[in-house]
Amino acid sequence: VLRSLREKIKHCQTKDLYRFSKIIKSLQKTKLTGSKQKKQISELSELINASVSTSKSNRKLIPKSIHFPETLPVSLRAKEIRDSLRENQVLIVAGDTGSGKTTQLPKICLDAGYGVRGLIGHCQPRRLAATSVAARVADELNTKLGELVGYQVRFNDRFSENCRVKLMTDGILLAEIQSDPYLSKYEVVIVDEAHERSLNIDFILGYLKRLISKRDELKIIITSATIDVDKFSNHFNRAEVISVKGRMFPVETRYLPMNLASEEKEKTISEKVCDSVISLAREASKGISDAKDILVFLSSEREIREASRVLRKKKHKNLEILPLYARLPQSEQSRIFKEHTTLRVILSTNVAETSITVPKIKYVIDTGLARISRYSFQSKIQRLPIEKISQASANQRKGRCGRIEDGVCIRLYTEEDFKTRARYTDPEIIRTNLAAVILRMLSLNLGDIFKFPFLDKPESKSINEGFKLLAELKAVNEFRKLTKDGRRMALIPVDPKHAKMLLVANSKNCLKELLIIVSLLSIQDPRESGHVELNEADYESDLYNSKNSDFLALINLWIIFEETRKLGNSSRLKKFCRQYRLSYTRMREWKEVYFQLTLTCRRIGLRINKKPSNYADIHKSIIAGSLNQLAYRSTERQYIGSRNKKFIILNSSVLARALPKWVVTGELIETTQTFAAMAAKIDPVWIEEIGEHLVKREVHSPHWSVRTQSVKAFERVRLYGLTIIEKTRVEYSSVNQEHAHEIFLSEGLSKSAVKTDAAFYKQNQQILEAIRAEENKLRRPEKFISENDINAFYSKAIPENITSTKELENWIRDPESGASKKLILDRMALFDNNENPSTNEFPDSISLSSNQIPINYTFQPGAKKDGATVQIPLQLINQLSDADIDWAVPGIIREKCIALLKGLPKATRKKLIPISGFVDDIISEMFELRGDLFKLLATLLIKQRRINIAPVQFANISLPDHLIIKINVVDKNRKSLAIGSNVNEVKRLLSKKGIDFQR
């Protein structure tokens, strides 16, 4: 019975096949009693019969006789293709332009008996192609669209349960893989326009390569016009190839002659185009035909404007010049389809190569150049360099003429140049960031991406770059496994960067605003660029522009558009769009994307905020997906971004004049220079918050902070080479506790920079102040105790985990610490060999009229107050003499005498050599005699060496500050009134201030 059922499931629906096979295997292994087994087999049999019945019903939906137009070349090969499809799992159909492959292949599949057990899925790269092909196939099968043949594109579908052929974009098929990894509802999958090699197409081709080994009943058809059949065939295990000629008229190819190549190099592209157009215009005027227009392929909008300007200067009669590029308003694009009588010249980018078919083209002029999007792994920028096109692209351009009669293709390069070009354009997968592909593969559990069967395997650095971006977005962990955020991001059908923005917006309660922004970033910008340059006064975007952010301008535009929509009908909306140069179609698409993303976000548990959010949270959310798109202004207009990227902000941005210091931008684009079209002012502090997992922190300059009574350091925060925060204070103990402890001891305690009421500290400070005073007298800092000695003392006593005054006080309060005994300095133990400094030569005071006049000692070389200062009360100044001052500090007399004698003229000094020896000879006698130092020194010079020196000469000799005893006159509150170096000087200063000192 089970063998019979196994045979029967070959006729059931493909979506049921795996499930039924699994149940049969289970029943074969399970040992059940007769009644139970019979019951399960009976239930399974009913399910299989129902599925087979569905297949029979589906067969009735398909016309018994399917007509293939004889005028189409593929129709002549229909039987061959049908038979080959039955015999092979994978079939490659290389059909030239006009062969009819796109419309006839799904019909051939129906004719071969497919579409009964499952759908015939037909992938197209563009929505317009999917919908128009579906309508055409339905018409040829004499059915209404949505009955036998339907379509599904983003936000729109015409599809019913009875549909056996499903046209769709490749993005739709990818989305279905998410929920149906085996594509079980499909019996045939057709991948059309495979030559375009977009990311989606390459991923689908790799996925199908794996899938065919798991579903041997699945049929795959790969088709395109310009396709490398050998590469595709080998990829699918030497798949069968059928080539079909196109329904084209002969096309004459004219190359730039070699002898003119060097001469033509001197001309600009616009001049070359102009010469060719004028020549062809003359040729066209001689004949009568339906096709006479000229299609010119140029590399950029700028080249189109320049060529248009040069052509208009020629003022050629009956020559209509039309531009064509993606950003051109739809109303201007549609002009190429309107009837006309004049000779028409269409100046186009490569949009006319595949996306748009321009009618009635007799001539093609190919410059051989195009902007090719390439991702730079070094700068992390999507570049748009102008490059030579491939041979396949050149032939695709050539195929734009010769469709309704003979054509001419003029190539503005030599035949030799053409032969040396690459055969095919590099696929998108090797010239873009792979983050989105990797995220999708991880979510589908497709295993090691390095082993995935891509048609062209990306380089390892490309894959690693994709993983780096996902790590930046926190979508993968250090093991390259999906995080919780990564799994949710994979469910949101937008770029991973934009998905990250939405997740962060959810946490910051600004999801509604970010849905508006991300929805627009996911489509082509609806704000149109006309062919004619606009004056700023003519441009009315100020209605919705924001002062500081292009992203907020999008929200403002959305609000205004919604208000207009609610107030009026579609005609009013269209008028609004024309007024503000907006594409009505893209504005509707924006709304549809917003609606779909909103549903997705709700489905995965995100909450849409009802109240408006704030500027900071909105832009923090944008930063979360744009951590590689941050920059600061370095010059008047130039910005420097991560990894030293230099760029400017376009004039179309609201920041073009404001140019704030820090910005977050949309994607940077590199053409002849790098620019940002969208930007917003930000606070760099937001970057640190959002990019916390990526920033590099450099802690430097650790120091003791008297204000906080702890060890602080400065932190520099960087992201991808950008210094976000130059200098912010941090607690150094959290960075390096051991070093912080050392600084606490050396710069805090040892330098007496600690503020505490602890008893040990007060006692130690008194001891240290007394010792420092003695050292200052002797002018020998650290003679008795150095900072190193103090540091060593505290280091032994204080635990290593203490780095601040607060921690020290907490430790002291602990009764088990024993701190009170450990922390008190022993004064006598500090002096070398118990040497106590003598105070005889450096007294603390002098006696004057039974009063003790204090002497202060300062050791500050170079400062005026360096040395000893006598603090004399105002009422005693008249009792003070210069002799009292001269002998107030006996310890400096010898050094002062030596300095005075060294200040004498050279001839005199020679008689005293050695001067120090002479002073030693007279010093004891000086101490016996005392009195005015200058007079005493002069007297002893005559007596000992017969040298006659007037005492006044010594008064004119400049002495070091520390050898001059200062007089500081103070009032009863110890406030300084006058400071001088002798009695007469201070009296003069007092008189000058009007202070009475005679009483």
What are these regions (language model features)?
Residues 1-501, 508:
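P-loop NTPase motor module signature
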Residues 4-7, 290, 310, 317-318, ...:
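Second RecA-like catalytic domain
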Residues 80, 100, 104, 128, ...:
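Generic recognition of stable, solvent-exposed alpha-helical segments in well-folded globular domains
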Residues 93, 478-479, 649, 879-882:
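Extended hydrophobic-aromatic, low-complexity segments
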Residues 155, 241-244, 636-642, 842-850, ...:
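Short acidic-hydrophobic surface loop/beta-edge motif
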Residues 180-195, 367-375, 379-380, 384, ...:
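Extended active-site and interfacial segments that coordinate phosphate-rich ligands
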Residues 249, 647, 853-855:
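Short, isolated positions in well-ordered beta-strands
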Residues 600-633, 652, 690-692, 699-703, ...:
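A positional "C-terminalness" feature that preferentially activates on distal terminal regions of long
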